[in-house]
């Protein structure tokens, strides 16, 4: 089995309706829509840390004697967009939104229907900002999530996922980032629980979990 989705007829109507809503929301919240390459050189993935920390989950190939990988995440592509032109601190925060098609070599035992597949379109955003803008921006994103979840009638719970064993950066930087996320989310009255060691290799995150009709929880969004 391909472990990837084929969509047709009413499924496409639903998908396109959601995309229309996505564009409406991101325009309202001042995001710039971007599109980034599907396949990129090994050197980029080495710079981002994915080659050393995520390669087992990536689909790789060789083209003209050079290593390439299909993107499992959109993050490096957003940085390429940022580097296309010079920026001033006055431009910050810069908010990029992307509906990026990503491929991840998930273990077969982890796959689950449409909830966990090997290829999917990710509603992704990357925000370039100054350190003193972190709190306000995290609050802003949380409110965007709240608006969208409320529309669809989706209650959610929040987890703060902290530094995993396999990570980049110093413990000091991780603690600063974890504290910044915790401070921002509590300042608007949101509760969270700590999920030790479940952060991404490149940083801590606030995971937003929803519940399906069978009572199972799924991580839907993250900051």
Predicted regions and their residues:
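Short, flexible loop/turn elements at secondary-structure junctions
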Residues: 11-12, 38-43, 63, 72-76, ...
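Metal-assisted phosphate- and nucleotidyl-transfer catalytic regions
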Residues: 150-219
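Active-site-proximal loop/short-helix segments
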Residues: 35-51, 114, 155-168
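Segments forming glycine/polar-rich beta-alpha architectures that bind adenosine-containing cofactors
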Residues: 17-33
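Phosphate/diphosphate-binding loops
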Residues: 26, 42-96, 180-207
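Short, small-residue-biased leader/transition segments that mark boundaries at the very start
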Residues: 2-6
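Hydrophobic alpha-helical scaffolding
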Residues: 7-12, 16, 68-72, 89, ...
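Conserved alpha/beta core surface patches that mediate binding of polyanionic ligands
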Residues: 1, 72-126, 131-148, 206, ...
């Amino acid at each position: 089995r391909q472990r990837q989705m084929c969509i047709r007829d009413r499924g496409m109507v639903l998908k396109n309706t959601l995309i229309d809503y996505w564009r409406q929301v991101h325009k309202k919240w001042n995001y710039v829509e971007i599109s980034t390459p599907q396949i990129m050189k090994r050197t980029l993935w080495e710079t981002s840390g994915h080659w050393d920390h995520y390669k087992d989950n990536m689909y790789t190939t060789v083209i003209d004697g050079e290593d390439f990988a299909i993107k499992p995440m959109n993050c490096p592509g957003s940085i390429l967009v940022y580097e296309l032109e010079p920026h001033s601190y006055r431009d910050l925060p810069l908010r990029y939104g992307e509906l990026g098609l990503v491929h991840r070599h998930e273990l077969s035992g982890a796959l689950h229907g449409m909830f966990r597949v090997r290829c999917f379109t990710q509603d992704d955003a990357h925000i370039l900002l100054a350190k003193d803008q972190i709190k306000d921006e995290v609050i802003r994103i949380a409110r965007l999530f709240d608006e969208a979840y409320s529309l669809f009638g989706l209650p959610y719970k929040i987890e703060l996922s902290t530094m995993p064993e396999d990570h980049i950066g110093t413990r000091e930087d991780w603690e600063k980032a974890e504290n910044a996320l915790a401070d921002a989310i509590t300042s608007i009255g949101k509760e969270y629980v700590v999920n030790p060691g479940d952060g991404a290799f490149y940083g801590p995150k606030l995971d937003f979990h929803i519940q399906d009709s069978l009572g199972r929880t799924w991580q839907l969004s993250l900051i």
